[in-house]
C-alpha cells in the first residue's frame, strides 16, 4: 500500500484542483449547479465546513488525494494542524472514533476517520440498497461523502430558517407569505442538491421500477421517462419494507431529474420530485421515517427533508390524523413485540411475527404518507411562490401534474408492498408447519395454555383441597385469541385457524401431573366426539370445567372472496348434541358442569341444545349442573345434585311419579330474565391495506334468552339429595325419603310421603313435610314450616317463622324457633316447643307438652290449651332470679336482668289464661310443672298458695320464684331429660346416641347461675 505524506499533498494541490474541476464538469450541468449552489448557501449561512488534517497523518492509497482535491473544488476549507492526531482528537473530538466535531473555526471533519470510512465504502454502498453502490461515479467516493455532509448541513440550516420564520409568525411577528415561499424554495434547492450529489446514475435506479412507464408515456415533458420505464420487473419481487420504498423512490427521483433533457434546474426543483427522497432510504435510512412521522403528527418541524414545511403556513389541508394513526401502529407493534417475548420461550413466535408485519407495513405507510404530505406541501409552496413571481405559471402548473402522477404511482405500489410483507410472514408459517408437522395457530393456543397454567398454578393446584378430593381433572378452554386470529387474517390463513382449543390437566397433592404415555391408557377427553372417561381413576376425583367449554364437534372452514378486496372465512360446525361422561367407579367424585356451554345459537333466535349424560360410580358423588338438560345416573352411594352454582332457570323438581328412591324429573324454565352461557359465532376483521379479511369463530356470551322461554328437562336416577337454585323453586317429593334444599329464593318444598329432610335456606320459604317422620329447617327468612302426619322436627332458623304440626295424640314433635319473632303451634301429641331468641308465641295444643325457655330469650307467650302433664324448663335460670305476678287471668313471670328484677317490664313469660276457669271449659291452661336449672319445681298449687300468702300478709301482688317452690332437687331433672330425649328421638328419626346439633341445643343446662345470692338478694323494682 502506498504511503502519502502531507507535504506531497500540498505540492500536488494545484494540479488536483484542475483535475477535480474537469471531473465535476463531466458529472453534468444539473449536478454541478446543485453542488455549487449548496456550497454557496452553506457559506452564506455563516458556517464553515473544514477538512482537518493533523501534521503526523499519513494517508492510505489515493483516497487522501481525492479528499483534498474534492474538498477544495466543493469550497470546503482544508486546514493542516501542527498538532498530532492524538492531541487534536482530545481537544476537538474527545475520542478518536468521532468523524465530525464543532470548533470555533466551524464544523470540522477529521480526515483520518474519513479516510478509514472510505476504505469500507464499497461494502457500505452494497448494503444501502437502490443504486447507492454507484454513488460518486462522477465525483469519486470522497466527493460523494463530502458533498453529502455539506448538503446535510445546508439542509439543516435552511430548515432552521423556516423554523425561525414559523415561530416568528406564530408569536405575532410580521412574516409575509413571500418570505415563507422563498425559504421553502431554498429548502427545496438544498434537498435537490442532496439528491443530485447522490443519485446521478439513472441506469442503476431505473431497473427497480414496476411497469409504470405506460402511465407516464403520454405525459408532456415526461415521455422519455415513460419509455425508459417500460418492461420492468413486477413490484412483488422487490424486497419488502423500507428497501422496497427506497428503491422505488430512488428510481423515480433519478429518472425525473436526469431523463428530462428539456427541464432546467429550476423546473426540476419546482416539480418537487426530489422531495420523494425524504425517506432517505438510499443513504442508509439515516433519518428514521418513524421519528419524522411522529414529529409531524405532533406539529413539530424537523431538519430532515421537507418536514419543516409540514408545520409551515404554506401547507394546505394537511391532516395530522394520518400521522397519528401511523404512530399508533408503531406503538401497537411495540406492545405486541413486548407481549411476544414470553410466548417465544413457550415455543410460539406468531406474536413477534405479527409485530414485525406491523413494523414493516408501518414503515411503508409512514414513508408514503410523509411523501404524499410533502408533495402537497411542495405544490402549496410553489403556488405561493408563483403568486410573488418567484417562479412562472407554467412551472406551477407542472407541479400539480407531476405530484399527482407520483402520488398515483405510490398509491398503486402500496398494496403490492403490503401483500409482499404478508407473503413473507405466510412463508414463515408454512415453513414452520412443514418442519414440525403441526398447525401453526394450534401451537399458538398451546403456548397460551402453558402461560395460563403458570399464571394460575396456585388456584388450579388447590382445587382438590377445596372440593375435598385426591385428584383434580381440570378441563380448560383456550378461547379465540385476537392476535392469533389477526395473524391468520394477515397471512391469508383464515381457513387454518381455530376458535380455540381445549385441554385436560391433572393435579394431585398440589402438583400438576405430567401426561406420560403409559400413565393414562385410554383417551380421557375427546372434545370432537363429546366423550369424557374417568372410569379408570382409582382416586376420589374432581372433574371441573375451569373456563366455559365450547360445544363438542368439528370445525370446518372455507375462505372465499366476497368482493374486490374482501375475503371471508366462513365457519361450519359439525356438532355433537351430547356430552357423555363415564364417572369414577369405586370412589366418590365431584362433577362440576357449571361452565359447560349447553346452548348454541344457530341464527334467527334458534338454539341447538347439548345434553349431559353422566354415568357415575358407587361412591358418594356431587354433581353441579349447568343451564342445559341432563341425564344423571348416580349409581350407589349418597349422591347430591346442585342447581345453584350458575343460573339454571326456574326449577320444578317432581318425584311424585317415582317408583324407585332417588328418581326425579326436573323441569327448568329459562325465561327472558335468565342468563345462560350461549355459544355464538362472531367475526374478526383484519385489514391489510385495501384487503379485508373476515374470519368467523366460535365464542360465548353469558346473556338472556332474547325474551323467549326455553324448557329444559333433567332425568335424575338414584340421587339422594337435591339443592335448588337462587330463584323461587318448587319441590314435590316422592313416597320415599327426600332431601331437598331450597337454596336462595322463596321456595315451596313438599316432602309428601317418606321420612324427608327439607331445608328452606335463604328466602321466605314454605316447607311441608307431608306424611312420615320429617325434619324441616327454615333457614334465613320468614318461613312457614308445616309438619303433617308423623313425628316432625321443625327448626325455623333466623327470621319471623310460623310452625304448624298436625299429628294425632301419638305424635311427637320438636319445634325450635331460632332467632326472630316466631309462632309455634303444636299438635294433639307430645310436643317440645322452644321459641328461641325473640318475642315468640308458643301454643302446645292438647297433648302433654314441654316448653323450654332460657335467660337470653325475649318475651314469650305460652298459650297452652290442654294436657295434664305440661312442663316448662327454665334451662339456665334459678328461681331466685324470677318473680310471678297475676294480671287478670294471665300469669306473668319476670326475670332478672343485670341483677335487677323489674316488675312491670314484661321480659320473661306470659302464661295466657292461666287463671281462667269457665263453666264447661275442659281446657287446662296451666303448666303442671315449672323446673329451674337446679331441678326445683313450682306447681300451680304451690304458686297459688304463695301468691295468696303474699297478698294476705304483705299486700304484694307478686311472689319470688324461690318462695313458690313445691319440691325438687337436681335428681328430679333426670325424668325431664329422658322425656325430651324420647321426643327428639322420635321426631325426625334422630338417634340420641349420635351427636345431633338439634338434640344438643335442647339438652338442659346444669351450669351454676351467673348471679351470686343471699336469699332473694337481687334488687327488686316495680314500675307501672
Curated annotation (Swiss-Prot):
The keyword Secreted applies. The chain crosses the membrane at residues 238-260, 268-327, 365-411. Gene3D superfamilies: Serralysin-like metalloprotease, C-terminal. Hemolysin-type calcium-binding repeats lie at residues 732-749, 750-767, 768-785, 786-803, 816-833, 834-851. GO terms for biological process: hemolysis in another organism. Keywords: Calcium, Cytolysis, Hemolysis, Host cell membrane, Host membrane, Lipoprotein, Membrane, Myristate, Plasmid, Repeat, Secreted, Toxin, Transmembrane, Transmembrane helix, Virulence. The keyword Calcium applies. It comes from the Bacteria. Residues 20-39 are annotated as: Disordered. A lipid is attached at residues 564, 690 (N6-myristoyl lysine). Residues 20-32 have a biased composition (Polar residues). One of its GO terms (molecular function) is calcium ion binding. Pfam families: HemolysinCabind, RTX, RTX_C. It is found in: Secreted; Host cell membrane. InterPro entries: Hemolysin-typ_Ca-bd_CS, Hemolysn_Ca-bd, RTX_C, RTX_pore_form, RTX_toxin/Mannuronan_C5-epim, RTX_toxin_determinant-A, Serralysin-like_metalloprot_C. Myristoylated by HlyC; the toxin only becomes active when modified. Mainly myristoylated, while a minor fraction is acylated with pentadecanoyl (C15:0; 26%) and heptadecanoyl (C17:0; 6%) fatty acyl groups. Fatty acylation is involved in binding to host membranes and promotes the irreversible insertion of Hemolysin into the host cell membrane. Can be activated by both myristoylation and palmitoylation, but HlyC catalyzes lysine myristoylation. PANTHER family: S-LAYER PROTEIN. The Gly-rich region is probably involved in binding calcium, which is required for target cell-binding or cytolytic activity. The three transmembrane domains are involved in pore formation by the cytotoxin. Bacterial hemolysins are exotoxins that attack blood cell membranes and cause cell rupture by forming a pore. The hemolysin of E.coli is produced predominantly by strains causing extraintestinal infections, such as those of the urinary tract. NCBIfam families: RTX_toxin (NF033943). This is Hemolysin, plasmid. It comes from Escherichia coli.
Amino acid at each position: 500500500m502506498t504511503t502519502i505524506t502531507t507535504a506531497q499533498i500540498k505540492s500536488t494541490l494545484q494540479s488536483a484542483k484542475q483535475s477535480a474541476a474537469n471531473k465535476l464538469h463531466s458529472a453534468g450541468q444539473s449536478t454541478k449547479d446543485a453542488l455549487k449552489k449548496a456550497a454557496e448557501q452553506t457559506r452564506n449561512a455563516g458556517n464553515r465546513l473544514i477538512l482537518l488534517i493533523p501534521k503526523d497523518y499519513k494517508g492510505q492509497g489515493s483516497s487522501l488525494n481525492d479528499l483534498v482535491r474534492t474538498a477544495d473544488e466543493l469550497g470546503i476549507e482544508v486546514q493542516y494542524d501542527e498538532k498530532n492526531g492524538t492531541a487534536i482528537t482530545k481537544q476537538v473530538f474527545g475520542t478518536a472514533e468521532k468523524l465530525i466535531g464543532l470548533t470555533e473555526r466551524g464544523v470540522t471533519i477529521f480526515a483520518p476517520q474519513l479516510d478509514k470510512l472510505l476504505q469500507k465504502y464499497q461494502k457500505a454502498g452494497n448494503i444501502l440498497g437502490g443504486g447507492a453502490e454507484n454513488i460518486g461515479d462522477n465525483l469519486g467516493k470522497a466527493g460523494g461523502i463530502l458533498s453529502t455532509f455539506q448538503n446535510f448541513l445546508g439542509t439543516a440550516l435552511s430548515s432552521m430558517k423556516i423554523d425561525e420564520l414559523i415561530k416568528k409568525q406564530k408569536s405575532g411577528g410580521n412574516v409575509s407569505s413571500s418570505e415563507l415561499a422563498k425559504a421553502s424554495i431554498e429548502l427545496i434547492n438544498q434537498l435537490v442538491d442532496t439528491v443530485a450529489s447522490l443519485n446521478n446514475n439513472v441506469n442503476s435506479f431505473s431497473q427497480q421500477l414496476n411497469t409504470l412507464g405506460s402511465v407516464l408515456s403520454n405525459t408532456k415533458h415526461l415521455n422519455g421517462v415513460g419509455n425508459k420505464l417500460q418492461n420492468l420487473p413486477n413490484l412483488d419481487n422487490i424486497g419488502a419494507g423500507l428497501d422496497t420504498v427506497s428503491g422505488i423512490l430512488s428510481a423515480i427521483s433519478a429518472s425525473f431529474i436526469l431523463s428530462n433533457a428539456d427541464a432546467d434546474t429550476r423546473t426540476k426543483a419546482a416539480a418537487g420530485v426530489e422531495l420523494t427522497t425524504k425517506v432517505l432510504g438510499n443513504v442508509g435510512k439515516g433519518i428514521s421515517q418513524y421519528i419524522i412521522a411522529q414529529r409531524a403528527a405532533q406539529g413539530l418541524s424537523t431538519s430532515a427533508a421537507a418536514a419543516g414545511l409540514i408545520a409551515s403556513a404554506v401547507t394546505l389541508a394537511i391532516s395530522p390524523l394520518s400521522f397519528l394513526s401511523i404512530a399508533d401502529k408503531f406503538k401497537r407493534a411495540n406492545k405486541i413485540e413486548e407481549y411476544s417475548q414470553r410466548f417465544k420461550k413457550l415455543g410460539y413466535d406468531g406474536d413477534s411475527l405479527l409485530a414485525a408485519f406491523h413494523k414493516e407495513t408501518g414503515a411503508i405507510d409512514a414513508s408514503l404518507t410523509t411523501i404524499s404530505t410533502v408533495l402537497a406541501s411542495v405544490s402549496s409552496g410553489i403556488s405561493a411562490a408563483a403568486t410573488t413571481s418567484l417562479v412562472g405559471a407554467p412551472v406551477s402548473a407542472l407541479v400539480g401534474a407531476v405530484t399527482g402522477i407520483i402520488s398515483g404511482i405510490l398509491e398503486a405500489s402500496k398494496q403490492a408492498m403490503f401483500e409482499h410483507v404478508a407473503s413473507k410472514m405466510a412463508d414463515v408459517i408454512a415453513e414452520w408447519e412443514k418442519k414440525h408437522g403441526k398447525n401453526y395457530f394450534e401451537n399458538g393456543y398451546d403456548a397460551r395454555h402453558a402461560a395460563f397454567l403458570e399464571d394460575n398454578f396456585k388456584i388450579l393446584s388447590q382445587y382438590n383441597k377445596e372440593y375435598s378430593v385426591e385428584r383434580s381433572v381440570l378441563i380448560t378452554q383456550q378461547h379465540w385469541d385476537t392476535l392469533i386470529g389477526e395473524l391468520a387474517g394477515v397471512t391469508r390463513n383464515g381457513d387454518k385457524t381455530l376458535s380455540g382449543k381445549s385441554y385436560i390437566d391433572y393435579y394431585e397433592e398440589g402438583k400438576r401431573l405430567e401426561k406420560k404415555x403409559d400413565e393414562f391408557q385410554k383417551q380421557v377427553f375427546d372434545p370432537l366426539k363429546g366423550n369424557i372417561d374417568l372410569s379408570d381413576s382409582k382416586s376420589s376425583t374432581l372433574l371441573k370445567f375451569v373456563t366455559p367449554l365450547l360445544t363438542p364437534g368439528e370445525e370446518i372452514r372455507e375462505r372465499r372472496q366476497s368482493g374486490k378486496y374482501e375475503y371471508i372465512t366462513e365457519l361450519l360446525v359439525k356438532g355433537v348434541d351430547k356430552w357423555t361422561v363415564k364417572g369414577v367407579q369405586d370412589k366418590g367424585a365431584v362433577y362440576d358442569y357449571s361452565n359447560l356451554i349447553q346452548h348454541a345459537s344457530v341464527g334467527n333466535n334458534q338454539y341447538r341444545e347439548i345434553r349431559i349424560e353422566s354415568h357415575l360410580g358407587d361412591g358418594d358423588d356431587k354433581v353441579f349442573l349447568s343451564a342445559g338438560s341432563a341425564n344423571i345416573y348416580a349409581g350407589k352411594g349418597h349422591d347430591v345434585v346442585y342447581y345453584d352454582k350458575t343460573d339454571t332457570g326456574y326449577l320444578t323438581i317432581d318425584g311424585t311419579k317415582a317408583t324407585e328412591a332417588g328418581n326425579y324429573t326436573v323441569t327448568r324454565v329459562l325465561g327472558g330474565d335468565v342468563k345462560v352461557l350461549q355459544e355464538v359465532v362472531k367475526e374478526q376483521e383484519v385489514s391489510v391495506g385495501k384487503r379485508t379479511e373476515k374470519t368467523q369463530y366460535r365464542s360465548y356470551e353469558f346473556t338472556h334468552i332474547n325474551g323467549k322461554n326455553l324448557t329444559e328437562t333433567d332425568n335424575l336416577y338414584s340421587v339422594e339429595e337435591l339443592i335448588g337454585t337462587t330463584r323461587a323453586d318448587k319441590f314435590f317429593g316422592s313416597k320415599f325419603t327426600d332431601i331437598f334444599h331450597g337454596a336462595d329464593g322463596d321456595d315451596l318444598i313438599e316432602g309428601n310421603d317418606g321420612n324427608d329432610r327439607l331445608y328452606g335456606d335463604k328466602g321466605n320459604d314454605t316447607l311441608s313435610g307431608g306424611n312420615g317422620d320429617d325434619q324441616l329447617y327454615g333457614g334465613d327468612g320468614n318461613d312457614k314450616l308445616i309438619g303433617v302426619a308423623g313425628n316432625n322436627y321443625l327448626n325455623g332458623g333466623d327470621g319471623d317463622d310460623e310452625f304448624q304440626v298436625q299429628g294425632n295424640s301419638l305424635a311427637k314433635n320438636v319445634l325450635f324457633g331460632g332467632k326472630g319473632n316466631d309462632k309455634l303451634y303444636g299438635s294433639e301429641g307430645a310436643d317440645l316447643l322452644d321459641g328461641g331468641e325473640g318475642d315468640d308465641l308458643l301454643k302446645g295444643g292438647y297433648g302433654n307438652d314441654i316448653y323450654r325457655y332460657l335467660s337470653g330469650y325475649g318475651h314469650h307467650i305460652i298459650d297452652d290449651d290442654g294436657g295434664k302433664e305440661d312442663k316448662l324448663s327454665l334451662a339456665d335460670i334459678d328461681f331466685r332470679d324470677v318473680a310471678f305476678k297475676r294480671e287478670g287471668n294471665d300469669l306473668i313471670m319476670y326475670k332478672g336482668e343485670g341483677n335487677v328484677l323489674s316488675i312491670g317490664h314484661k321480659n320473661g313469660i306470659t302464661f295466657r289464661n292461666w287463671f281462667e276457669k269457665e263453666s264447661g271449659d275442659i281446657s287446662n291452661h296451666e303448666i303442671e310443672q315449672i323446673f329451674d336449672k337446679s331441678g326445683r319445681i313450682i306447681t300451680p298449687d304451690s304458686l297459688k298458695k304463695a301468691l295468696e300468702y303474699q297478698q294476705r300478709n304483705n299486700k304484694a301482688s307478686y311472689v319470688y320464684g324461690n318462695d313458690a317452690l313445691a319440691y325438687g332437687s337436681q335428681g328430679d331433672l333426670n325424668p325431664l331429660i329422658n322425656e325430651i330425649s324420647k321426643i327428639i328421638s322420635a321426631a325426625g328419626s334422630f338417634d340420641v346416641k349420635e351427636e345431633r346439633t338439634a338434640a344438643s341445643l335442647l339438652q338442659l343446662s346444669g351450669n351454676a347461675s351467673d348471679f351470686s345470692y343471699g336469699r332473694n338478694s337481687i334488687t327488686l323494682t316495680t314500675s307501672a
